[in-house]
Amino acid sequence: MDLGIRGKKAIVCAASKGLGKGCAEALAREGVDVTICARGAEALNATAKELGASGVKVTPVVCDVTTEAGRKALLAACPDPDILINNAGGPPPGDFKDFSSEDWRKAVEGNMITPLALIHATVYGMMQRGFGRIVNITSASIKHPIAALELSNGARLGLTGAVAVLARKACKSNVTINGILPGPFDTDRLRGTTQKMAEARKVALSVVEAERKAAVPAGRFGSAEEFGAVVAFLCSTHAGYITGQNLLIDGGGYPGSL
């Protein structure tokens, strides 16, 4: 299927690895020019080189997008994107009793205020041009809270609520805003949390990994490639009637019908 977005321009945040990289790869395969950002120059430039093999224009921007200066640098590199993929690593796990006001501020800054600032900077240009696709990568915690991830639960749910009305307004101009709610995907973050769980229990990493996979009805973790394919479709010309939705991709893990 031709997604109809060849020649479009996209910003993909946190795209040097993991789910962000999967999204950038999927868009590049469809002929989309991509501006990618991350804080680590080495990994970002390596990803940019890989993406360039698709024949599209790839612009890497080394920055901390959670800062105003970082967002300014990113938007200077691509001031008029047709596609915006908001993505950020989640806040650290912990216990509610131990979280400080500063912990909450950082969580909200990184996972709510930053994507909202990028949306505010780009959505109105998209509306004027008559095409835009915004995808917020959040978390399965939007559907069901995840223990020990209260910081992420709160900040990501805040973002989801904040864009709900805008999604209904922007769609009249062929601009959609949707959320993708990933469950367990084979990423550095998941491997890191699995390692910590194994260390805390003093068991082998393979034991915890097997337990986590067994808890997923699909019997495995998701891949960044299949995640990116879903995001690319939501960015396509065929998805203009899908907006304000939050799509859970978790291998069947959510135990509800709705």
Where are these regions (language model features)?
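A short, exposed helix-loop element centered on a Lys and neighboring polar residues
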Residues: I119-H120, A164
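Substrate-binding pocket helix/loop in short-chain dehydrogenase/reductase
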Residues: D95-K97, D103-V108, R212
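Short, small/polar-rich loop/turn modules that mediate ligand/substrate recognition or access, typified
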Residues: C171, T176, I242-G244
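Short C-terminal tail/terminal secondary-structure segment
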Residues: H144, A232, T243-L258
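Alpha-helical segment proximal to the catalytic Tyr-Lys
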Residues: Y124, R168-K169, G240
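Catalytic loop of short-chain dehydrogenase/reductase
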Residues: V135-L159, V163-K172, P184-F185
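Conserved glycine-rich cofactor-binding loop
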Residues: A14-G18
